[in-house]
């Protein structure tokens, strides 16, 4: 971390639908495993405290009250965890139900990031239970505490100013204008996504390209944690397809249908350097997104990611041949223009 490498984890847990305390126990267990692996940013799937597939059970008051108690337990567990943790849950506020990602650190709930885009097509019908999040974050009263609630909340490490994290939820990144765009423009260098993206033929490839593209477009790290086995299969099947990407490159990807935890390191110093050099990546002059501080220990990071000895030479032979042909064609076209001009 002292050299700019931040270890992150995307974790799929073994959930039981509507069994809040089983899910709480699994989240706490996997959180400790991620911390033991050195992760400073830990991301869990969408609605993982209850399961994404609770359907009309989401409207039951007893479930929502248990969610609050379980979230308090998970938050307390972070008091002994040097990490910023994102956990998905349903949250009832002012008579409305929202799909949120809670940010937890040092025993506290720092904020609730709301889902902006609710899918209501095909196999999805989230508008049946949930309300779309507000356009701007506001402060709400939650269990006697004043906590930020809304989209595009920025979480900044008190010990490392350049480490700014923001979250979005599943469908948000599939939308025409994801919330992460504005968050990145205001300084977020790592983006977390608590997701429940189902499996259909070919969707995994599209998902990979989507996450790669978003990390490249925003010159950022992207940590994508997906729901997996344990969800109801009445309408859909989830594969636990977790992805960690950095500036257009996938650093780590989970084997689908295995409920894995993946861990890798994101080089935020490199990302910051690339943003400074890229004049088209304009940060906003008027900053309006809310910011909350979190705490981590700044220490050496043990690297698990690999670095190619020949970074400009693709290891894949087909890609290498394509690259060589491209180089020759670029040179040939340049030479052709020169010869035509001088003769």
Place the predicted regions along the sequence by residue.
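Enzyme catalytic cores with a strong preference for nitrogen-chemistry domains
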Residues: 1-343
């Amino acid at each position: 971390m002292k050299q700019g490498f931040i270890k992150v984890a995307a974790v799929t847990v073994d959930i039981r639908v509507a069994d809040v305390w089983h899910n709480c126990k699994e989240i706490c267990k996997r959180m400790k495993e991620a911390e033991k692996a050195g992760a400073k940013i830990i991301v869990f799937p969408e609605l993982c405290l209850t399961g994404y597939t609770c359907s009309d059970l989401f409207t039951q008051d007893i479930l929502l009250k248990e969610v609050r108690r379980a979230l308090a337990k998970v938050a307390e567990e972070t008091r002994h965890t040097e990490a910023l943790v994102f956990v998905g849950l349903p949250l009832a506020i002012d008579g409305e139900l929202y799909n949120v990602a809670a940010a937890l650190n040092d025993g506290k709930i720092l904020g609730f990031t709301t889902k902006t885009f609710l899918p209501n097509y095909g196999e999805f019908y989230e508008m049946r239970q949930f309300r779309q999040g507000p356009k701007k974050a506001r402060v709400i009263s939650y269990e006697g505490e004043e906590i930020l609630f809304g989209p595009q909340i920025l979480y900044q490490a008190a010990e490392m100013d350049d480490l700014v994290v923001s979250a979005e939820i599943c469908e948000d990144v599939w939308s025409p204008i994801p919330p992460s765009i504005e968050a990145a423009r205001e300084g977020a260098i790592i983006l977390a996504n608590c997701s429940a993206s189902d499996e259909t033929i070919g969707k995994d490839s599209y998902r990979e390209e989507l996450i790669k593209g978003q990390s490249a477009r925003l010159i950022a790290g992207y940590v994508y944690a997906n729901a997996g086995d344990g969800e109801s299969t009445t309408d859909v099947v989830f594969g636990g397809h977790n992805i960690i990407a950095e500036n257009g490159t996938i650093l780590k990807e989970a084997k689908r249908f295995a409920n894995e935890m993946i861990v890798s390191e994101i080089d935020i110093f490199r990302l910051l350097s690339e943003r400074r050099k890229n004049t088209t990546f304009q940060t906003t002059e008027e900053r309006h997104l809310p910011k909350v501080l979190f705490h981590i220990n700044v220490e050496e990071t043990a690297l698990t990611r690999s670095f190619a000895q020949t970074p400009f030479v693709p290891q894949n032979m087909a890609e290498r041949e394509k690259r060589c042909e491209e180089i020759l064609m670029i040179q040939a076209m340049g030479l052709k223009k020169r010869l035509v001009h001088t003769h």
